[in-house]
């Protein structure tokens, strides 16, 4: 018997559309929470595939980095040119608890600061906070005209630039190495370090637009859940009852 195709068999209809499944039905929304050092805690939402088999949704979320405008976190448009990076470290329920991961300026702000007839001074230094976070801070400053100055330009001499840069690194080292990451974040928001540099360098050459333009996280310590929960205003300690001390009494069996 010859083996081959049987043309008389009914063929399946070609061109039938396959049933398309919406990929969003397999995903869940999670709320991103900013640390308590910022005024606005609800940053936004993120999508992740649901937990299936060995793939855990929490593992997919941990380590995610989100970039948020500081103006949104502080509810102040004056901070619109600064961007904050937050890293997801822990997932509790539908909330992603984040920690500070870095800070940067928008490119349009940096370009607007650079002008003619003035000197640009930059400095960067690697510091370690008291809670063992290794950070690299980048500072930027510009010279300005002295009072009653007639000369058009405000160029600083090479020796003055070196002296200013040395002062900048000293102040950044002092301010950053004597506090925790949370305390440093609190200093960066109102630009305390920039004002300190401006005051300290008045005797060398007057400065303007002094900013910590970038903060880069190089190394983080071992993850501590308790520290993260404290950062978010929560606690991981369980409420325990008070221990009651009672005298030991030996049971005496009655004779039958």
UniProtKB/Swiss-Prot annotation:
InterPro entries found in the cross-reference section: Ribosomal_eS1, Ribosomal_eS1_CS, Ribosomal_eS1_euk
Residues carrying N-acetylalanine: 2
Ribonucleoprotein listed as a keyword: yes
Chain segments annotated as coiled-coil in the UniProt record: none
The keyword Ribonucleoprotein belongs to this UniProt entry's keyword annotation: yes
Matches recorded under Pfam families: Ribosomal_S3Ae
UniProt-recorded name of the protein: Small ribosomal subunit protein eS1
Species of the source: Botryotinia fuckeliana (strain B05.10) (Noble rot fungus)
Top-level taxonomy: Eukaryota, Fungi, Dikarya, Ascomycota, Pezizomycotina
Chain's gene name: rps1
């Amino acid at each position: 018997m010859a083996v081959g195709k049987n043309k008389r068999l009914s063929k399946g209809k070609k061109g039938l559309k396959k049933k398309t499944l919406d990929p969003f039905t397999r995903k869940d929304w999670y709320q991103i929470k900013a640390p308590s050092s910022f005024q606005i805690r609800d940053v936004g939402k993120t999508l992740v595939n649901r937990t299936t088999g060995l793939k855990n949704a929490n593992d997919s979320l941990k380590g995610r980095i989100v970039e948020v405008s500081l103006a949104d976190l502080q509810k102040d448009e004056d901070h619109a040119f600064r961007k904050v990076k937050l890293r997801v470290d822990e997932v509790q329920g539908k909330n992603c608890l984040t920690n500070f991961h870095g800070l940067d300026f928008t490119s349009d702000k940096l370009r607007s600061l650079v002008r003619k007839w003035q000197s640009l001074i930059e400095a960067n230094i690697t510091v370690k906070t008291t809670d063992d976070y290794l950070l690299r801070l980048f500072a930027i400053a510009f010279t300005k005209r002295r009072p009653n100055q007639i000369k058009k330009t405000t160029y600083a001499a090479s020796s003055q630039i070196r002296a200013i840069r040395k002062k900048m690194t000293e102040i950044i080292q002092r301010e950053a190495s004597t506090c925790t990451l949370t305390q440093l974040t609190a200093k960066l928001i109102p630009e305390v370090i920039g004002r300190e540099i401006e005051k300290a360098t008045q005797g060398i050459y007057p400065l303007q637009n002094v900013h910590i333009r970038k903060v880069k996280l190089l190394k983080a310590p071992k993850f501590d859940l308790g520290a993260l929960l404290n950062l978010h205003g929560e606690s991981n300690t369980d409420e325990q009852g008070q221990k009651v001390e009672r005298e030991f009494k030996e049971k005496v069996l009655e004779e039958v």
